[in-house]
């Protein structure tokens, strides 16, 4: 769900049914979003959904995240893996218990446990999630309106969806402007606008190149990389701050 915009999960689910693959939703950007009226993370169309609570996300626990699933079997497996693959559940053990202290490592897990302090930080923000996302959507709608007529494309929102609006990404119409993508990015940064580029296509990274992937292999991802710019969007953003972003974009592009 890139940038918070829900994918067309019914179509992805249909493909999963046809070809027999599991579906894991990456909802790192999409907390607070909805698809066909239901919250992202209810796993109606997937096996697992993962959320990130990294510091830059809409809700943060400083680090960590959450996994949701409707499968008791997957939930039990996740519970095991999050704590070194260690269990005190006798039904999962291979040997008889030696006593009240006994445990067994039955799988190769890791320490994925969030601390209670981190969890408390996250819980304290959940009551405000609706307001956070509503404010981001209002700011995004204002961007949509005030950026009209400029040589760029604003984000789409598919029918029957409600975006978490983690990011607001514009795509430059390169053939309609006199500067390059990089020049536009640099000029916005020089003028104090905190733009970024989310993200570099993963198949162009050195690790994946070693697997045989090459830069000209995924045209849409590469086209996106060559014209996308993320502009500032945060729930505490004021209209005056947003107006400044828009003013500078106009000055750079027109």
Give the role of each language-model region.
Residues 1-61, 66-74, 230, 234:
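Active-site phosphate-binding strand-loop segment of PLP-dependent enzymes
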